[in-house]
Amino acid sequence: MSKLNPYFGDFGGQFVPQILIPALEQLEAAFIAAQQDPEFQQEFQDLLKNYAGRPTALTLCRNLTKGTKTRLYLKREDLLHGGAHKTNQVLGQALLAKRMGKNEIIAETGAGQHGVATALTCALLNMKCRIYMGAKDVERQSPNVFRMRLMGAEVIPVHSGSATLKDACNEALRDWSGSYDKAHYLLGTAAGPHPYPTMVREFQRMIGEEAKSQILAREGRLPDAVLACVGGGSNAIGMFAEFIPETSVRLIGIEPAGLGIETGKHGAPLKHGKLGIYFGMKSPMMQTDEGQIEESYSISAGLDFPSVGPQHAYLNSIGRADYVSITDDEALEAFKTLSREEGIIPALESSHALAYALKMIHQAPDKEQLLIVNLSGRGDKDIFTVHDILKSRGEI
């Protein structure tokens, strides 16, 4: 059986307790076989099309770019069933779990979007489902918690550590190490131990594949840049993968600058972290001077992750992709702008990517540029957060 490379340059690997190695090897073998199995691919494609609603639209912004020479398109992953790009790869991994004869799913979630995608998929495929979620996130994402429970998932709040995504990840891995014979750990992003970063990329790459053929059909040329927000990095790698060989296309990943990089309250390990080993992989991460994992911070729960997927670390190291950061306030502004100008309410995560695109547009209004922003999710889950912030500022 051929093996996949566990590394992207110096990044990635498989740093897990010995007890989990057989489970990861089984997963890699099943993934390789499934990728070459027309029956598996057909079932996956059928679910993507007839259950999740692919292909998603590529929408030209009519009003945001008025008075400029930019054409800005949004790849509408917010229209996918479940409300975000997460559903794509969850369907893929769940089918893989069934193929391995496993009928229980363990998952972690931050914003709750991965949890919702996992819950709906498990309901559809008749699988048992337990989802670990930081107690803080349970509080700030109550609509998604109810959605998960409504669809039959067990949601387990995690109170240890900072009670956010990284702690939920730790608990999920702990659970899996005692139950991997019957349970599959359905990791929610393109990070973690090999083969997850590769597998999640492949189960998300239709985002970029569709966007590429859609933009060629609409504009007759490739975009000048594609932009996506980066937490763990699955929506971004799904958008970037197809464009990596197209060297004329700039790849721009947007990390959360939170309250400002200088405050230390951010989630931008690619540009402001140090190389370390965490969550089963070697990648840049936010660390204290003693080398402990530092708490990340972002207004958006889905970007509140102290590390980043290894392929992004690699693309950054070779200069193929540029990584920048956007603050909470800039993301909020973009959230309001898209809602008011185009009638589309974006997730706060996606608002980071949009905010950087708006910066590019306003810095060079006379520059003819063709941009695609991956609108990775819809903002329904964030309206209470945004409402409370705007109310406290006297804006509503």
Swiss-Prot record:
The beta subunit is responsible for the synthesis of L-tryptophan from indole and L-serine. Its EC number is 4.2.1.20. This is Tryptophan synthase beta chain. The modification N6-(pyridoxal phosphate)lysine is found at residue 86. Keywords: Amino-acid biosynthesis, Aromatic amino acid biosynthesis, Lyase, Pyridoxal phosphate, Tryptophan biosynthesis. It catalyses: (1S,2R)-1-C-(indol-3-yl)glycerol 3-phosphate + L-serine = D-glyceraldehyde 3-phosphate + L-tryptophan + H2O. GO terms for molecular function: tryptophan synthase activity. The keyword Cell membrane does not apply. Belongs to the TrpB family. HAMAP family: Trp_synth_beta. The keyword Ubl conjugation does not apply. PROSITE patterns: TRP_SYNTHASE_BETA (PS00168). Its cofactor is pyridoxal 5'-phosphate. InterPro entries: Trp_synth_b_CS, Trp_synth_beta, Trp_synth_beta/beta-like, TrpB-like_PALP, TrpB-like_PALP_sf. Pfam families: PALP. Pathway: Amino-acid biosynthesis; L-tryptophan biosynthesis; L-tryptophan from chorismate: step 5/5. One of its GO terms (cellular component) is cytoplasm. NCBIfam families: trpB (TIGR00263). CDD domains: Trp-synth_B. Tetramer of two alpha and two beta chains.
